[in-house]
């Protein structure tokens, strides 16, 4: 078993100011998006669409607003609505954590629609350009989660090579033991807990880095190297992220205040299903639209 290093969540101390790793990872993610965007400007078909470096800079302004506002509101509404309705001022305590990817996704989508309207472009043309810029930012965010030792995975077999002990999960581990006697006996977890006061878990943050971040980036980046029907790149992002997140959620510990919902699925999985379905529908629409336009021009 591997013991999580339990990093200091503060990366840099500047007198009374503290720069946290999680915030730093957001910065890394936005920088990565800019770099990927500038690389995409070199593609002939992208340049022919009139994209410029200034467009990328302006997109990032909209993207930051959409990510932060959408991510926070998504967490408030999707995950802890009852709490925040009772404590409305706590909505603004972003330093205490609480961001939702699905909320951030909706926020960025609306922000890109606004950007498209101002630039007189079709919003799908904008999201097609942006989609390959997103996954490395997601990977950076999940790395921030791992450094913080949060959003850990479900309890697993201690003999598994990926099994990891998370000091931050001690209280959850103690509460987990009496609820799962069969697994405790099967995996000899009582002995493990007696020795470490922790239980082995999936490092699900690393799985998300690999699937939602690195793998999805290469799939989108390679797919977007050639001209595709409008909406196809955006559709592939929806399908790819939705499938990756849905899969990883089987190894990720559900939020303790929600648990598993209908059909034994987590909130993250239920929110990912519409993304997958919308992506499939959009992909079919994109290619049928191109075929119809080609037939009309023939």
From Swiss-Prot:
Using the UniProt record, name the top-level EC class of this enzyme in a single word: transferase
E.C. designation(s): 2.5.1.145
Give this protein's Gene Ontology molecular function annotations.
phosphatidylglycerol-prolipoprotein diacylglyceryl transferase activity
Transmembrane domains' residue ranges: 17-37, 59-79, 97-117, 129-149, 204-224, 230-250, 257-277
Keyword list (alphabetical) reads:
Cell inner membrane, Cell membrane, Membrane, Transferase, Transmembrane, Transmembrane helix
What's the stated role of this polypeptide? Answer: Catalyzes the transfer of the diacylglyceryl group from phosphatidylglycerol to the sulfhydryl group of the N-terminal cysteine of a prolipoprotein, the first step in the formation of mature lipoproteins.
- Could you identify this protein by its name? Phosphatidylglycerol--prolipoprotein diacylglyceryl transferase
Origin organism is Burkholderia orbicola (strain MC0-3)
Question: What lineage, starting at the top, does this entry show?
Answer: Bacteria, Pseudomonadati, Pseudomonadota, Betaproteobacteria, Burkholderiales
Q: Which gene encodes it?
A: lgt
């Amino acid at each position: 078993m591997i013991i999580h290093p339990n990093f200091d969540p503060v990366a840099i101390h500047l007198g009374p100011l503290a720069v946290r790793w999680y915030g730093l990872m957001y910065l890394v993610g936005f920088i990565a998006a800019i770099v990927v965007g500038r690389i995409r400007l070199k593609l002939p078909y992208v340049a022919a669409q009139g994209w410029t470096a200034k467009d990328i800079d302006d997109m990032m302004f909209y993207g930051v607003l959409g990510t932060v506002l959408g991510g926070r509101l998504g967490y408030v509404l999707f995950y802890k609505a009852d709490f925040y309705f009772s404590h409305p001022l706590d909505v603004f305590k972003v330093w205490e954590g609480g961001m939702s990817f699905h909320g951030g996704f909706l926020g960025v989508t609306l922000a890109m629609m606004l950007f498209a309207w101002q630039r007189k472009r079709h919003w799908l043309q904008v999201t097609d350009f942006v989609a390959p810029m997103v996954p490395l930012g997601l990977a950076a965010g999940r790395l921030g989660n791992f450094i913080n030792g949060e959003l850990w995975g479900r309890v697993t077999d201690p003999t598994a090579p990926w099994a990891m002990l998370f000091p931050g999960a001690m209280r959850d581990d103690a509460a987990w033991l009496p609820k799962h006697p069969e697994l405790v006996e099967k995996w000899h977890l009582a002995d493990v807990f007696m020795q470490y006061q922790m239980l082995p878990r999936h490092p699900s943050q690393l799985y998300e880095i690999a699937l939602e971040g690195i793998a999805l980036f290469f799939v989108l980046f390679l797919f977007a190297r050639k001209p595709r029907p409008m909406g196809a790149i955006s559709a592939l992002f929806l399908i790819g992220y939705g499938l990756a997140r849905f899969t990883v959620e089987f190894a990720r510990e559900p939020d303790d205040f929600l648990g598993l919902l209908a059909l034994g699925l987590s909130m993250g999985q239920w929110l990912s299903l519409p993304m997958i379905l919308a992506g499939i529908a959009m992909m079919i629409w994109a290619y049928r639209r191109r075929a119809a336009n080609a037939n009309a021009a023939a």
